[in-house]
Amino acid sequence: MKISVNWLKDFLPSFSPDITSLVEKLTFLGLEVEDVESTPLPDLRVVVGRVQSVALHPDADRLRICMVDTGLEEPLQIVCGAPNVAEGMLVPVATEGSRLTMQDGTSFVIKPSKIRGQRSFGMICAADELGLSADHSGVMELDSSYAVGEPFARYLDSDTVLDIAVTPNRPDVLSHLGIARELGSAPDAILFPEEAPLEFSADSPLVQVMDSGACPLYVGVIIRGVTVGPSPRWLSARLESIGLRPKNNIVDITNFILHALGQPLHAFDLQKLKGGRVIVRSDFSGSFTTLGAEQCTVEPGMPVICDTQMPVALAGVMGGLDSAVGEGTVDILLEAACFAPSAVRRSARKAGISSDSSYRFERGIDIRNVLPAARAAVALILETAGGTVGEATLQGDPSPALLVLPFRPRRANELLGTAIETDAMQAMLARIGFRTLALDEGVMQVEVPSCRIDVLQEIDLIEEVARLHGYDNIEASGRLAATYPASRTRPGYFPDFLRGVAVGLDFREVLTNPLIRREEAAPFGDGLVSVLNPISEGLEVLRPGLVPGMLKVIAHNIRHGNRDMRLFEVAHGFSVADPSGAAEQGPLGAYCEKEWLVLALTGNRYPRSWNQPPDRVDFYDAVGAAEMLLGKLNLLDKSAVNIYNENTVSIDLELTEGKKKRSQRAGRAMRLDSALLSQFGIEQDVFTVELDVSVLEMLYSPDVVYDPPSKFPAVQRDLSFILPGTVPVQSLVGLVRSSDPLIRDVSVFDVFERGSGGGGERSVGLSISIADHSGTLQEGRISEILRTVGVNAESKLGAVIRQV
């Protein structure tokens, strides 16, 4: 963004800075100055001249022979090729010996010459030939305030232009007024342009806003009887100083207000508006021609300004060619509006158009600045183009309530490591427009100016204090002191604890985007949460879970040659709480947000080696990983793995509520379907474990009770059971383990299927470890325990001990 130092003086009359100090001050305020350009004054031998006559060149159709009065006894003959040179014009004339420095930095000296056989004793100059701007469309036309024969430089002020890099969160400084606010000692010291008194009507048919979400405020002013023509020199000079080419007085004023006050404006030729009115709508589908003479396709969701028949502007982005102000314009409709940043961003992206207006609307403008900017523009139009104000209408609230934030000076000093007095902080904030409404028990109530849409909470105010105090004035501390509790609270700690456990199990963490394509999310649920304003067409829904993102990571790695992976992620999934809308809404309204831990395994179980063949991971690796993780959380004894189908098992945890116990679903382990994997371009098996973090945290207990091993020898007994095919082996293992307190461990050493499809009987071999802390086990006690095991298995599960 280019800022003219001379233009800044319009807002700060006493402003006379040293440029080096100014650049340093802006930098410390967080506004990086990328470039500094000084505009030198033209050579004193460049004088004001009057074109007395213009004749065609006898040997060149595009050249003219001009006789120019420069205050000397005889007029100078000058050959000129500018298309706009005309008799009676006041122009800058470079006389013999003048050294001209162009806009690009090159220079040359004017000498008498012959051009196509005709003598020329000087040059009538365009703006770029004097280094004033990049405009080379024609010679400069001066107004009547210039005196013939006077050095042109006497009418100019040397200027310095700063090119400032503005971060996206600071739209308030995208104007000369915004920079003046940063530099000013107080808001009252800033001079605002003169405003025209206007009476607005809220119920006029002139403007109809059909989408108030996209356009919360629209101001329209009709000015009749204007004369469209060249802008006065002061106005052209302001625009040229920042690299803009003047067009006509109406358009130049809209550009002037944009760069002066930061409020985009647009002027319509009222006679070209069908029905003499405008409608703001977002449901139009069609096309229109922009000011740049390009066809723009409009889709529903893109706000447009329409007359009664067709679009005349893409709201906040660019106007239309068919309603543009030109030389024949007599009546205009001046638009000053506030358009929603998301709506303008979407329109500009889809249309492929970027403009000074869209740049500001996309970042957010000051809604309270719309009316003052409109009044200032009307005053300038009446001054430079004449005319009278007709109807003025306003749709929306031009002065919404300001945000008030609590601010603790003590907290600011703690975070910044400073000892700034409360009065000093109050004065700093007041300097940039933050008013202190009250101060009670060390807490200030601070009113945020409407232009500072980036200040939303106390920490933002603390940042402002640091910025205004000066980061270089904050002394380095001799010691480090934490300003947060020594131990993190459990809700913030548990996900990190899970990450540590997963890393300890040889899984690697991935971080995936919560926004994904609708096609990627569709296989994982119906209640998808759509984003109203997606940042791109490929990121239009929130992920229902973590598996879609995990599969994208796996596919990416496989494409790059890495086929063996053990990955995990802890993050949130999102869904509509009840897609049918019948259920009562929860704390998040119609939406559900849940935190998940997902493990994913694919490829070989072990790294490739000379001493063992490749061994692929399988379903039991996933279940085993889940059990190991539950073991680290002291939840393995409370867990049960239940078969859901041949590719999926549920993982349930035992929950105690008073004297009752119930099963709580914690997650699942599964082998992903090959058809699903093919959608992501994966041709090898992938196994996943999904665990609900809230359930794990609810049941997790960090307290571990030490159970010492028995001093007496343990006894191992192997039993073989005939188990119905419908009963999970896990149920048998759990039942045997709970049959007697002396049973220390139960493990499966053999499974033999007698039937197919999971419906037949199975032979399951269990190894049972029995130990007593009080003494050596006797055979009678061992036999009693095994009989109890057999009775429980047969009565509760239908499992029979197989006799050998």
UniProtKB/Swiss-Prot annotation:
It comes from the Bacteria. This is Phenylalanine--tRNA ligase beta subunit. Residues 40-153 form the tRNA-binding domain. The keyword DNA-binding does not apply. Tetramer of two alpha and two beta subunits. It comes from Chlorobium luteolum (strain DSM 273 / BCRC 81028 / 2530) (Pelodictyon luteolum). Keywords: Aminoacyl-tRNA synthetase, ATP-binding, Cytoplasm, Ligase, Magnesium, Metal-binding, Nucleotide-binding, Protein biosynthesis, RNA-binding, tRNA-binding. Its main location: cytoplasm. SMART domains: B3_4, B5, FDX-ACB. Belongs to the phenylalanyl-tRNA synthetase beta subunit family. Type 1 subfamily. Its cofactor is Mg(2+). It is found in: Cytoplasm. Mg(2+) binds at residues 454, 460, 463-464.
